[in-house]
């Protein structure tokens, strides 16, 4: 397994719409394993393949406190949603920034597991929010897109400055 590089906003590759997974190969299993390793190393609760420059409809999630409830969603689609909620969301691709994002409180999702087996899942609270957040990545959308243009621009400028400083330090 390997830790993958996480793309950072405003990298345009984050805007790529992910393609459906067509075949379930050993390479796909390695991608899923690497995504989990990366997510845990970055102390995240979810990661979409788009964030690691793999433009396929793959999501890994683990919202458990002890990191013992990994969930893989391949080619996910929301079948139903209800309610309204929101929490301050963060994102591995937008480090050190959080914002309140409106989300459905409950979702019913259909997806394939890592072996290509179809399943449906009903989720609420943090898991529902995380699924919606990661599914946004698959269509090239980030949580900052829910913010005003001014707030989005401020975040962009701060992250660009951080990236410049990181490059100077090398």
From Swiss-Prot:
GO MF terms, alphabetically ordered: metal ion binding; peptide deformylase activity
- Residues reported to bind Fe cation: 91, 133, 137
Gene3D superfamilies of this UniProt entry? Peptide deformylase (3.90.45.10)
User: Which EC number(s) does UniProt give?
Assistant: 3.5.1.88
Which enzyme class, named as a word? hydrolase
Textual note on the cofactor: Binds 1 Fe(2+) ion.
Q: Where does the chain cross the membrane?
A: none
CDD domains with a match to the protein in the record:
Pep_deformylase (cd00487)
Its keywords, alphabetically, are: Hydrolase, Iron, Metal-binding, Protein biosynthesis
Instruction: Give GO BP annotations, semicolon-separated.
Output: co-translational protein modification; translation
What Pfam families does the record point to? Answer: Pep_deformylase (PF01327)
Q: Which reaction does it catalyse?
A: N-terminal N-formyl-L-methionyl-[peptide] + H2O = N-terminal L-methionyl-[peptide] + formate
Stretch forming the signal peptide: none
Q: Which residues does the entry assign to the active site, renumbered to this chain?
A: 134
HAMAP family this protein is in? Pep_deformylase
Under PANTHER family, the record lists: PEPTIDE DEFORMYLASE (PTHR10458:SF21)
Q: What is this protein for, i.e. what is its function?
A: Removes the formyl group from the N-terminal Met of newly synthesized proteins. Requires at least a dipeptide for an efficient rate of reaction. N-terminal L-methionine is a prerequisite for activity but the enzyme has broad specificity at other positions.
Name by which UniProt lists this protein = Peptide deformylase
Q: Which organism is it from?
A: Aeromonas salmonicida (strain A449)
Q: Which gene encodes it?
A: def
């Amino acid at each position: 397994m390997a830790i993958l590089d996480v793309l950072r906003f405003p990298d345009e590759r984050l805007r790529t719409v992910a393609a459906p997974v067509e075949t379930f190969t050993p390479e796909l299993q390695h991608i899923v394993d690497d995504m989990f390793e990366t997510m845990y190393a970055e102390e995240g609760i979810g990661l979409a393949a788009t964030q690691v420059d793999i433009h396929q409809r793959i999501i890994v999630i683990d919202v458990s406190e002890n990191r013992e409830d990994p969930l893989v969603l391949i080619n996910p689609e929301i079948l139903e949603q209800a309610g309204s909620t929101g929490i301050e969301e963060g994102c591995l691709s937008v480090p050190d920034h959080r914002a309140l994002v409106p989300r459905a409180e409950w979702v019913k999702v259909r997806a394939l597991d890592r072996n290509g087996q179809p399943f449906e899942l009903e989720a609420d609270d943090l898991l529902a929010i995380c699924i919606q957040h990661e599914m946004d990545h698959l269509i090239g959308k980030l949580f900052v897109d829910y913010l005003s243009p001014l707030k989005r621009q401020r975040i962009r400028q701060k992250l660009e400055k951080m990236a410049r400083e990181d490059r100077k330090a090398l």
